[in-house]
């Protein structure tokens, strides 16, 4: 018998969202999954030579955790 209250909540219909639009639905422990790049907008698959302009990893981390980037 599994222990009660140790397992995460399971969502059967979790949307994968890109640019504010749900792309598909999967089962997950998260209520919503955000992606920046998807098959439909990836430069390799769309034959475009544009550079994807997104925030760098450090900037996203600092923004996520509310860290001020000024040197005090």
UniProtKB/Swiss-Prot annotation:
GO biological process, one term: translation
Keyword Ribosomal protein (UniProt): yes
Keywords attached to this entry: Chloroplast, Plastid, Ribonucleoprotein, Ribosomal protein, RNA-binding, rRNA-binding
PROSITE patterns reported for this sequence: RIBOSOMAL_L31
InterPro entries xref list: Ribosomal_bL28/bL31-like_sf (IPR034704), Ribosomal_bL31 (IPR002150), Ribosomal_bL31_A (IPR027491), Ribosomal_bL31_sf (IPR042105)
Compartments reported by the entry: Plastid, Chloroplast
GO-annotated cellular components: chloroplast; ribonucleoprotein complex; ribosome
Coiled-coil annotated residue ranges, if any: none
Keyword Ribosomal protein: yes
GO molecular function, one term: rRNA binding
Function: Binds the 23S rRNA.
Subunit and interaction comment: Part of the 50S ribosomal subunit.
Family under the similarity heading: Belongs to the bacterial ribosomal protein bL31 family. Type A subfamily.
Protein name per UniProt: Large ribosomal subunit protein bL31c
Source organism of the structure: Trieres chinensis (Marine centric diatom)
Gene encoding the protein: rpl31
């Amino acid at each position: 018998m599994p222990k009660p209250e140790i397992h995460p909540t399971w969502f059967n219909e979790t949307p994968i969202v890109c640019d504010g639009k749900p792309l598909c639905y999967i089962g997950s422990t998260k209520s919503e999954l955000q992606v920046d790049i998807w098959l439909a907008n990836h430069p390799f698959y769309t034959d475009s030579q544009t550079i994807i302009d997104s925030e760098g990893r450090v900037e996203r981390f600092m923004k996520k955790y509310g860290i001020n980037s000024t040197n005090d």
